[in-house]
Amino acid sequence: MRARELRAQTLDQMKDELVKLKKEQFNLRFQKATGQLEKVSRVKQVRRDIARVKTFLRQKINENKV
């Protein structure tokens, strides 16, 4: 997910995206534990996407407070 795309999203869209990414992260961890994970790099990518979404979510919340 690109930063440009995140900036254009609303708070609700970002929250939905965060839930989706957390579910994907859970599934990837489960696949890794059972030895079924094919794309190991996806774990790192999802983790960073979660951090990116949380960062922009916090920025939007702070902008609305001011």
Swiss-Prot record:
It comes from Bartonella henselae (strain ATCC 49882 / DSM 28221 / CCUG 30454 / Houston 1). This is Large ribosomal subunit protein uL29. GO terms for molecular function: structural constituent of ribosome. Belongs to the universal ribosomal protein uL29 family. One of its GO terms (cellular component) is cytosolic large ribosomal subunit. It comes from the Bacteria. InterPro entries: Ribosomal_protein_uL29 (IPR050063), Ribosomal_uL29 (IPR001854), Ribosomal_uL29_sf (IPR036049). Keywords: Ribonucleoprotein, Ribosomal protein. One of its GO terms (biological process) is translation. Gene3D superfamilies: 6.10.140.1970. SUPFAM superfamilies: Ribosomal protein L29 (L29p) (SSF46561). The keyword Repeat does not apply. The gene is rpmC.
